[in-house]
């Protein structure tokens, strides 16, 4: 049904008042998902308009979009989207800063430890000396990534395992907020064989010392990039320091569409939201900022790749991964971070007078107020 925005707001205000443990009845569920669909359709149409304004927009088999030289597109992203996926390796359960967009916001001091001397790969625990066994018994991934939480809290532990995967010819990338980088530890990572280092520049609002570390990293590591959630705060600080940032010699910017979970959602209450394919919930402005940066890169000829790491991209990533694993046609682990629709989060979207649905129809009989047994 093409529910009107007025009716959508009325029903979502009602649903937001219901007790969390009270399930919606079937007709109510239809109404709820009709509203989510109407919002998503309007946002998708806006995205198409913005993409049409980007010169020389490239796609990776329809799985994602980027601007810049296709030959410079990240091998880590290529592995994620067309290879064996992200292949996350976890070790460090601590972080030295607190970011409002962090998925572990409010829980950083109680993250489960991996264990002394151990590395977690897809729920299995290994010592460095076990990696040879793993490589000899399993299908080799096209790439691996070091995640969770800030690896530079104990970066001295990483070179040994990096050397193992380097010797096996497997592409490796790592994420960092950049605040603990030094010439010495960056050199050690480069010498061990790290292929990509990605800086979350939004974590520090584009701090000068982190920008300098990007330049230093480029001396030792083949590919150096920015990967950060797209927020108005990041966009503002990036524009203020754009020339200095681009002068570091970085190779690409991975524009992550900010998606929310119960931990970080409270930091963005009041922001217009939408949901992608009944999965990730995101501020509407996040991917729009990505498109603004992509257009700016193309028009100003930055000479780097700017990549749209959106909810759509992550949807494609999981389809690719499940297919590579031999999953059923259509199988995916892409899903919402919420047990039920966070109705309150969508009220700002429905209350925004500038946000319009593409089509509207009167509610059919049986779905109007008073028709449904509540």
Segments and roles (model prediction):
Residues 155-163, 182-190, 209-213, 238-241, ...:
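Distinct, well-ordered alpha-helical segments
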Residues 211-317, 331-342:
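Conserved C-terminal portion of the radical SAM core fold
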Residues 136-137, 187-193, 246:
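Non-catalytic positions within long, well-ordered alpha-helices that form the structural scaffold/packing
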Residues 103, 158-169, 190, 213-219, ...:
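Surface-exposed amphipathic alpha-helices with a cationic face
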Residues 6-91, 106-113:
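N-terminal [4Fe-4S]-dependent radical SAM core
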Residues 2-9, 14, 33-36, 305-374:
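Accessory C-terminal segments flanking Radical SAM cores
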Residues 107-125, 138-154, 168-181, 192-209, ...:
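Core AdoMet radical
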Residues 90-100, 150:
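Cysteine-centered iron-sulfur cluster-binding motifs in ferredoxin-type domains/subunits
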């Amino acid at each position: 049904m093409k529910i009107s925005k007025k009716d959508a707001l009325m029903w979502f205000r009602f649903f937001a008042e219901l007790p969390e443990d009270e399930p919606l009845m079937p007709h109510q569920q239809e109404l709820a998902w009709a509203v989510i669909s109407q919002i998503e359709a309007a946002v998708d149409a806006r995205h198409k308009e913005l993409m049409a304004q980007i010169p020389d927009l490239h796609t990776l088999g329809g799985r994602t979009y980027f601007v810049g030289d296709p030959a410079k597109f990240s091998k880590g992203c290529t592995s994620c989207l067309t290879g064996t996926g992200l292949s996350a390796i976890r070790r460090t359960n601590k972080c030295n800063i607190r970011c409002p967009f962090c998925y572990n916001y409010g829980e950083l001091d109680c993250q489960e430890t991996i264990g002394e001397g151990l590395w977690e790969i897809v729920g299995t625990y290994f010592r460095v000396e076990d990696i040879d066994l793993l490589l000899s018994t399993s299908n080799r991934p096209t790439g691996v990534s070091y995640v969770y939480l800030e690896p530079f809290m104990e970066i001295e532990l990483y070179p040994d395992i990096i050397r193992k995967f380097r010797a096996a010819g497997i592409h490796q990338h790592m994420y960092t907020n950049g605040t603990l980088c030094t010439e010495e530890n960056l050199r050690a990572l480069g010498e061990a064989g790290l292929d990509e280092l990605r800086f979350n520049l939004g974590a520090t609002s584009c701090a000068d010392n982190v920008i300098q570390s990007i330049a230093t990293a480029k001396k030792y590591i083949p590919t150096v990039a920015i990967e950060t959630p797209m927020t108005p705060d990041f966009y503002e600080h990036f524009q203020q320091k754009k020339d200095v940032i681009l002068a570091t010699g970085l190779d690409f910017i991975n524009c992550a569409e900010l998606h929310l979970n119960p931990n970080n959602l409270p930091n963005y209450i009041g922001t217009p939201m939408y949901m992608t394919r009944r999965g990730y919930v995101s501020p509407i402005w996040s991917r729009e900022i990505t498109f603004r940066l992509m257009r700016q890169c193309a028009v100003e000829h930055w000479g780097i790749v700017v990549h749209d790491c959106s909810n759509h991209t992550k949807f494609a990533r999981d389809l690719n991964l499940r297919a590579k694993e031999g999953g059923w046609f259509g199988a995916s682990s892409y899903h919402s971070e919420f047990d039920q629709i966070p109705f309150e989060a969508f009220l700002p979207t429905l209350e925004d007078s500038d946000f319009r649905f593409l089509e509207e129809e009167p509610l059919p009989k049986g779905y109007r107020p008073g028709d449904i047994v509540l």
